[in-house]
Amino acid sequence: MGFGDLSPTGSRGRAPGLMASALLAEVLRGGHVESVHSGSVVVCDAEGAVVFAAGDPERAAFPRSAIKALQALPLLASRTADRFALTDAELALACASHSGLPIHVQTAQAMLHKAGRDGTCLECGIHWPSSTTAARALAAAGHTPTALHNNCSGKHAGFVCTAVAAGQDPAGYIGPDHPTMRAVTGAVAAVTGAALGAENRGVDGCSIPTFLTPLRALATGFARFGTGRRLPAEFAAASVRLRRAVAAHPAMIAGEGRFDTEITAALGETAFVKTGAEGVHAGALPALGLGFALKVDDGAGRAADAATAALLLRFLPAHAVLERWARQVLTNWNGLAVGELRAV
């Protein structure tokens, strides 16, 4: 993957706080470049040593949903998962940005029932399923979505379970000062080594805190997540269970036709990958002892998917699924091939 140097603002100079980015992906039409996507990517080991980088490895980004697996660590480390006998499918959903399919909704609901709660406890907000099939079926039945359809409902169900198991009132768990959320933030800080405080805190789409974090710290954290190195014993054990759960249930992590599900179904435990909003992806290559993090400057998920697939091809054996995501044929409404999106 030959990432080329490119300023995030082209000839007008660099955006404030950004070093030169790298060209990560481009869109071609008729053999000519129509659009380009720049950004930064870094691969680290568990000690934080940079193995590969393009763009600015210290570039800070809000990791968004890319760190859901790290946010799920207290669910296991606190023994909440054991207390409520959460299944591997439920643990996978706790790491997911799901499509709102019936199986996703039912699984989140089952998690809450084990804690004696229901969907009214969720504070993630409500949106229609991202699966058009699921959304149309819901509307055709005369129903409207609930918080259980939110793509983050599995993660939030895990937060509610953790609070209940600790004897806490789960109300307000999305706030930065709620004991459960403090444990979640503390886990992410411990794994990544990043300083997470009010000065770099924002509010995520599902209303929990999200913190501006250097890509290098995210990559290091995922190297640790993938290997257990430099982690407390309880987090190391939790990481293994979460990785295995997601690998065993790839349909839970996202949904049919989506990047996370297709890559996980193809590679199993060879790679852990997770997408986040605004072009952030992160993950681990456990057997190689590496973690990675990537941010596309303009937030384009299509570019992040392609660049992540190409990055995996750099470190792993060739695989048809990776190659298809790294270089995607673009078609129009008549089904004609009109161009391609490709990592560069």
Question: What function would you assign to each model-found segment?
Answer:
Residues G30-V33, H149, T270-K274:
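Short Gly/Pro-enriched turn/cap motifs at secondary-structure boundaries
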Residues V36-V41, A157, T185, E278-H281:
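Short glycine-rich loop/turn motifs
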Residues L76-F84, G116-T120, G167-G172, H178-T185, ...:
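Bacterial peptidoglycan biogenesis and beta-lactam-recognition machinery
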Residues A54-F62, A94-H98, A141-N150, G202-P209, ...:
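A short glycine/serine-rich beta->alpha loop
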Residues G2-L18, T87-A198:
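Active-site-adjacent helix/loop patches that line small-molecule binding or acyl-intermediate pockets
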Residues A223-V344:
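Structured C-terminal helix/loop/strand segments within mature extracytoplasmic catalytic/sensor domains
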Residues P63-T80:
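Active-site SXXK
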Residues G2-L6, G10-E58:
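Beta-lactamase-like hydrolase cores
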